[in-house]
Amino acid sequence: MKPVLALSIPVLALALTACSAPEAPISFSEENTAAAYAVPALPSFDELPVLETLPDPLAFADGSGRALKLRDWERRRAEILAQLQFYEVGTKPATPKECVSARMENDTTLVVDVTVNGETLTIHSTLKRPEGEGPFPVIIGCGFGGPGSLPRPIFETRDIATVSFPFWEVMSHTQTRGNEPINKLYPELTEIGAYSAWPWGVSRLIDALEQLRDSRLDLRRIAITGCSFAGKMALWAGAMDERIALTIAQEPGGGGAAAWRVSETLGEVETVGRTNYAWFKESMRDFSEENVSRMPMDHHELCALVAPRALLVFGNPDYPWLADRAGYVSCVAARRVWAQYGIADRMGYSFQDKHMHCALPQEEWPELEAFVDRFLLGKDVPTEVTTAPMFEDTDLSQWINW
């Protein structure tokens, strides 16, 4: 008779722990882990099918199945990135790190030189580090320095370094096509929108931070934020660079978190036909009005590109132009990607009214603090944030059927 192996409860628990799947990373050492994947088929506008509901963010473009395991997400992520660049914002240039050099001009001014084909673009960033040895987490503020429009005390009291991203040194928010700083390096990229160029600039800024000696920075824990058009900027940058651990998109509206399809049903809000085309490819106009249903992707998938890293979206329904009902639908849909991988609490959204544009109300401070504490400081705190009481009457089944 064969002997029976008996495991004590502690030994069995240890064995099960050892066999369990590793926790999904909160950031990566590479800008784009999906860069090696082949570009999927990208049909012309006339060849695209009509889809009234939001596309399934997990479904592979070739119809071969769904990305049900986290290990499959990298491939699906590559497809969504390709679609967003091809149909909306244009190609984000792939610039080798060897083209980037960094130096501190003084205690707080970081100078970043990006040289391509003998031409140089320079970014001047303000870097403020807490006193002490560190290493300190980092938050990049798009456009307006520090932590963007977020409350400074939340970051100052937690010893978090702040880095500014002066977007105008890469591309103006009004863009003259072919005559922007980035075109010194890439004169052929006249069709790209700012939401391709600005994330490129953020990535070069991160390259520079990686080069600094004795920086006292913890570059495994980088956050990015911005509000309004800079909230869109932060979202696009966080979606496109996987070295960013936490993306905080404050009131990003249409072109940011809001799903284009839903926005088209909401009246006088930012839609494909009513947006700033300095930010997008001119050809995106083809998807205006009823043609929005031909888009092979939508912005719940832009949000989902941040997965498995952390994303927090703040909305402000008092400003109709932001199309926050569309933002809510998009966030609910995107969060299902994190949920599929057992990490739904890495994606949060909070829609609060009765406050000024880009002024985070006191009620939302604890939600922000929780995400900062967990994903920048590594604390074990709950981050289950799904607040949108004014949109509870939304018929989600109209948009989400997967």
Which residues does each PLM region occupy?
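Bacterial N-terminal signal peptides that target proteins for export
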Residues: 1-9
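C-terminal motif of bacterial Sec signal peptides marking the signal peptidase cleavage site
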Residues: 16-18
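Bacterial signal peptide processing site
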Residues: 20-22
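Alpha/beta-hydrolase-fold serine-hydrolase catalytic core, especially in secreted/extracellular enzymes
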Residues: 25-124, 129-134, 307-311, 316-402
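Loop/turn elements at helix/coil->beta-strand transitions in domains of secreted/extracellular proteins
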Residues: 135-139, 157-162, 219-221, 242-246, ...
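Cap/lid segment of the alpha/beta-hydrolase catalytic domain
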Residues: 141-213, 253-262
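Mobile cap/lid helix-loop segments that gate and shape the active-site cleft of serine hydrolases
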Residues: 251-302, 323-331, 339-344
